[in-house]
């Protein structure tokens, strides 16, 4: 008998295969787009290497989550947290959230991601600790949002989007902890 809050091995295999396939397609897409002159896509070898490393890290985090717990809420929490971190890192390094990617205020987004990675590494496998860590990330995101506003940068919409992902992750980790302890 399977428990409704646990993911089956078959479902895990399907999602893992789909995830790595999507990462490969996302890496191949710019190469295909570059074959057409009118697309404006012009990646260098270093762009492909960077994207490959980032996709491998994201995939690796999902693999760690799959091994850490079969709980669906736990895995969904990881997806929300990784999505927030990945999007902040990708957007900041590609074009910048505040002005261009060279604006030093963009480092606040990288600081959030690095903090999330650090606290998650310490708490991995402990959904209750991860829930608290993601709540702290939401608070840090809001703190930086306030600092951006004081500095004259209106980033509230995107900051609140990232904050909502951290809160979603926190709530899902809490649900996973509650399901684990009964």
PLM features: residue spans?
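Membrane-helix interface "capping/anchor" motifs
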Residues: 66-75, 121-133
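Membrane-interface helix-boundary motifs at transmembrane edges
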Residues: 8-12, 65-77, 178-181
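N-terminal membrane topogenic signal
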Residues: 7-22
């Amino acid at each position: 008998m399977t428990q409704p809050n646990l993911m089956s091995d078959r479902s895990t295999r399907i999602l893992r295969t789909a995830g790595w396939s999507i990462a490969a397609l996302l890496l191949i897409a710019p190469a295909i787009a570059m074959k057409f002159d009118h697309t404006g896509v012009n990646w260098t070898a270093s762009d492909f290497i960077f994207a490959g490393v980032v996709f491998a890290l994201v995939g690796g985090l999902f693999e760690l989550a799959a091994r850490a717990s079969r709980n669906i809420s736990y895995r969904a929490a990881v997806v929300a947290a990784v999505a927030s971190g990945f999007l902040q890192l990708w957007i900041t390094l590609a074009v910048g959230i505040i002005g261009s990617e060279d604006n030093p205020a963009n480092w606040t987004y990288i600081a959030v991601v690095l903090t999330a990675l650090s606290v998650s590494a310490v708490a991995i496998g402990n959904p209750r600790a991860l829930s608290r860590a993601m709540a702290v990330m939401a608070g840090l995101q809001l703190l930086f949002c306030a600092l951006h506003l004081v500095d004259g940068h209106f980033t509230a919409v995107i900051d609140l989007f990232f904050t909502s992902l951290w809160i979603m992750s926190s709530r899902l980790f809490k649900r996973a902890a509650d399901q684990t302890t009964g």
